[in-house]
């Protein structure tokens, strides 16, 4: 028995009798040592897959094929933007984002209070385009990521104008505009060049992202509620294109929608995609 435990045990890897050292060292002792970083390799692959955008909607296909090169072409025909990659493709690296606030919100359930996090994110390129996104999620990172996507989907054009003579580039709001959300009311008044943005911290950041250099603002209501404050400012900027001024009184020449203009391109793409599917089914 001693010889069995000594010689056989030594062969099996230790002096623990017949079981050897490590209990199953021959089968799983080197598990995971020579395989490399398992988890990180898969994550890297997912990141590379996410960078490649495969458009799903008609508008996305037109943008990816450079049939549409400006956001104004989308706004002119009031086309709904369903993919945030469209904004990334058209605006590019000039689009910046900032988290305005992250606040915990709670819901009373049978098991107790369920806490989630609500994120407010503003995006803009500083050249007449701004968006606002609000997202609630269990994790802060997920809420911020979702709010950025929603902010890109809600990007709207901001109309800029002059305070006096039309010299140089537009620098302020075209006229007095008012936005409201809840009890908060934000009013913007055109300002002469060089005045700067006279506003509180929250609307000032939104106006900077919108590309407005000079403006006077006044606010009323519970401006302590940051969510309503930033929504009222965004509503105010949306209304800059909500009225007609004398320069828009001219007779409008209507142009065809991009869907009608590039209908051959969209139809051929769809036919080729269906052909590939049917061929794959036939082979199977």
Swiss-Prot record:
It comes from the Eukaryota. Residues 95-158 form the S5 DRBM domain. GO terms for cellular component: cytosolic small ribosomal subunit; nucleus; plasmodesma. The keyword Ribosomal protein applies. Pfam families: Ribosomal_S5, Ribosomal_S5_C. One of its GO terms (molecular function) is structural constituent of ribosome. Residues 20-29 have a biased composition (Gly residues). PROSITE patterns: RIBOSOMAL_S5 (PS00585), S5_DSRBD (PS50881). One of its GO terms (biological process) is translation. InterPro entries: Ribosomal_Su5_D2-typ_SF, Ribosomal_uS5, Ribosomal_uS5_C, Ribosomal_uS5_euk/arc, Ribosomal_uS5_N, Ribosomal_uS5_N_CS, Ribsml_uS5_D2-typ_fold_subgr. Keywords: Ribonucleoprotein, Ribosomal protein. Residues 1-19 have a biased composition (Basic and acidic residues). Residues 1-51 are annotated as: Disordered. PANTHER family: RIBOSOMAL S SUBUNIT (PTHR13718), SMALL RIBOSOMAL SUBUNIT PROTEIN US5W-RELATED (PTHR13718:SF115). Belongs to the universal ribosomal protein uS5 family. This is Small ribosomal subunit protein uS5z. It comes from Arabidopsis thaliana (Mouse-ear cress). The lineage of its organism: Eukaryota, Viridiplantae, Streptophyta, Embryophyta, Tracheophyta.
């Amino acid at each position: 028995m001693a010889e069995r435990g000594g010689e056989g045990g030594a062969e099996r890897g230790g002096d623990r009798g017949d079981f050897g050292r490590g209990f199953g060292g021959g089968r799983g002792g080197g598990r995971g040592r020579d395989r490399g970083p398992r988890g990180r390799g898969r994550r890297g692959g997912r990141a590379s897959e996410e960078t490649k955008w495969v458009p799903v909607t008609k508008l996305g296909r037109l943008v990816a094929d450079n049939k549409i090169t400006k956001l104004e072409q989308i706004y002119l025909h009031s086309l709904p933007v369903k993919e945030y990659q469209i904004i990334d493709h058209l605006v590019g690296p000039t689009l910046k984002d900032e988290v305005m606030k992250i606040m915990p919100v709670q819901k009373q359930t049978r098991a107790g209070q369920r806490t989630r996090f609500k994120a407010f994110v503003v995006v803009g390129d500083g050249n007449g385009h701004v968006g606002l996104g609000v997202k609630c999620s269990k994790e802060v990172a997920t809420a911020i990521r979702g709010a950025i996507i929603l902010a890109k989907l809600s990007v709207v054009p901001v109309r800029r104008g002059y305070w006096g003579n039309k010299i140089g580039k537009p620098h302020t709001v075209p006229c007095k505009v008012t936005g409201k959300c809840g009890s908060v009311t934000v009013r913007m008044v055109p300002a002469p060049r060089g005045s700067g943005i006279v506003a509180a911290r929250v609307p000032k950041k939104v106006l900077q992202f919108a590309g407005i250099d000079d403006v006077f603002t006044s606010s009323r209501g519970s401006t302590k509620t940051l969510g309503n404050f930033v929504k009222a400012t965004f509503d105010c900027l949306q209304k800059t294109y909500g009225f007609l001024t004398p320069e828009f009184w001219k007779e409008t020449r209507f142009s065809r929608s991009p869907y009608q203009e590039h209908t051959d391109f969209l139809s051929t793409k769809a036919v080729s995609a269906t052909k590939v599917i049917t061929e794959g089914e036939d082979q199977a």
